[in-house]
UniProtKB/Swiss-Prot annotation:
Protein name as it appears in the record: Ribosomal protein L11 methyltransferase
Entries under CDD domains matching the protein: AdoMet_MTases (cd02440)
The species this protein was found in: Aliivibrio fischeri (strain ATCC 700601 / ES114) (Vibrio fischeri)
Family matches, as InterPro entries: Ribosomal_L11_MeTrfase_PrmA (IPR050078), Ribosomal_PrmA_MeTrfase (IPR004498), SAM-dependent_MTases_sf (IPR029063)
Gene Ontology biological-process entries: methylation
EC supergroup of this enzyme: transferase
Organism classification: Bacteria, Pseudomonadati, Pseudomonadota, Gammaproteobacteria, Vibrionales
Keyword RNA-binding included in the entry's annotation: no
Gene3D superfamilies recorded: Vaccinia Virus protein VP39
EC number of this enzyme: 2.1.1.-
Function in brief: Methylates ribosomal protein L11.
Length: 294
C-alpha cells in the first residue's frame, strides 16, 4: 500500500518535541531524523539522543491520513515558526527487504580477506571468507573504521596468535582474526546484544569454539594477548587506555579506530609512552592508530 511522508526542517532544540507531537497527536507511524546540512555528530552520551543543529524530520503516515489535520496540529503546537516550510509526498510501496539486500555486496580487504553477505555468491572460494549479514550490532565492513581494522588484521601474521577484540560488536573482527590464522580470540563488549550477535555470527562461520565472548565484568583476570584491536570511540579509548594497554603483551600489536582525524593525535598521545606507534592511517576522515608495545 502507498504511504504519505511529511518533511519538515527543525533544530536540535525542538526536533524531538516535534517528533513526539507528530506521533502522539497526529498518528504518525514513524519518525526519522536526518542531518539537514551534512554536519557530523560526535559521541552522544549514554541514553542521549544527539541531533544536528539543523535537522530534517520525516514523518510517515498511511495513505488515508488527513494531511490538513497534521499541518493544523503543527501550527497549533507553536513548535515551528509561522509559515514554516514543509513538503508532503506520496511514497509507493516497495519490496524494502529486497531493496535493502541489494545494497550489500561482497567486500575485499587487503589481498585475501572477503566479507560476504550470505545471499551473495562468494567471489573467491579459496580466499579467506567471512560470512556476515547486516544485523543487530555494529560492524559489517561498510564503515571506514571497520574497514581500517580489517585491513590491519589482514596484514598481520596471526598464525597461532591470541587476539582480543575489545568492543566486538557484531564479531566481524574476531571472526576475521580466526579465519586469518589466530589460534584463539577473546571478544569483549559492554552490550549483551553484541555478545549474542557475535556468538551467532561465529556459529554461522564455524568458529564458535575458537572465540570466547565476555561482558567486561566477566572477562578472565590477567587477560593478555599478542594482538589487540579496539574499534570503539575516542572517548573510551582515552578513558580506558590503561586497561587496553594492559591487554597487550610486550612486543604485541595494538590497533584502534572509531577515531576522527581531529581526535587522532590526542588519542595517540595516551599510548605513545607504552607503544612505538605507526603513522596514523586515515579513511574518509576516520583514523586508525596502531603500534607495537615496548
Amino acid at each position: 500500500m502507498p504511504w504519505i511522508q511529511v518533511k519538515l526542517n527543525a533544530t536540535s532544540e525542538n526536533a524531538e518535541q516535534i517528533g513526539d507531537m507528530l506521533m502522539e497527536e497526529t498518528g504518525a507511524l514513524s519518525i526519522t531524523f536526518l542531518d539537514a546540512k551534512d554536519t557530523p555528530v560526535f559521541e552522544p552520551l549514554p541514553g542521549e539522543t544527539r541531533l544536528w543543529g539543523e535537522t530534517d524530520i520525516l514523518a510517515l503516515y498511511d495513505a488515508e491520513a488527513d494531511m490538513d489535520f497534521v499541518i493544523t496540529q503543527l501550527k497549533a503546537s507553536r513548535l515551528l515558526e509561522e509559515g514554516f516550510a514543509h513538503k508532503i509526498e506520496q511514497l509507493e510501496d516497495k519490496d524494502w527487504e529486497r531493496e535493502w539486500m541489494d545494497n550489500f555486496h561482497p567486500m575485499q580487504f587487503g589481498k585475501r580477506l572477503w566479507i560476504c553477505p550470505s545471499w551473495r555468491e562468494i567471489p573467491e572460494p579459496d580466499a579467506v571468507n567471512v560470512m556476515l549479514d547486516p544485523g543487530l550490532a555494529f560492524g559489517t565492513g561498510t564503515h571506514p573504521t571497520t574497514s581500517l581494522c580489517l585491513e590491519w588484521l589482514e596484514g598481520l601474521d596471526l598464525e597461532g596468535k591470541t587476539v582480543v577484540d575489545f568492543g566486538c560488536g557484531s564479531g566481524i573482527l574476531a571472526i576475521a582474526a580466526i579465519k586469518l590464522g589466530a589460534a584463539k580470540v577473546i571478544g569483549i563488549d559492554i552490550d549483551p546484544q553484541a555478545i549474542l550477535a557475535s556468538k551467532d555470527n561465529a556459529t554461522r562461520n564455524g568458529v564458535a569454539d575458537q572465540i570466547e565472548l565476555y561482558l567486561p565484568q566477566d572477562q578472565p583476570e590477567g587477560l593478555i594477548a599478542d594482538v589487540v584491536v579496539a574499534n570503539i570511540l575516542a572517548g573510551p579509548l582515552r578513558e580506558l587506555s590503561g586497561i587496553i594497554t594492559s591487554l597487550v603483551k610486550p612486543q604485541g600489536q595494538l590497533a584502534m579506530s572509531g577515531v576522527l582525524d581531529t581526535q587522532a593525535e590526542d588519542v595517540a598521545s595516551y599510548y605513545a609512552e607504552q607503544f612505538d606507534l605507526d603513522a596514523i592511517v586515515e579513511q574518509q576522515e576516520w583514523c586508525r592508530i596502531s603500534g607495537k608495545k615496548k
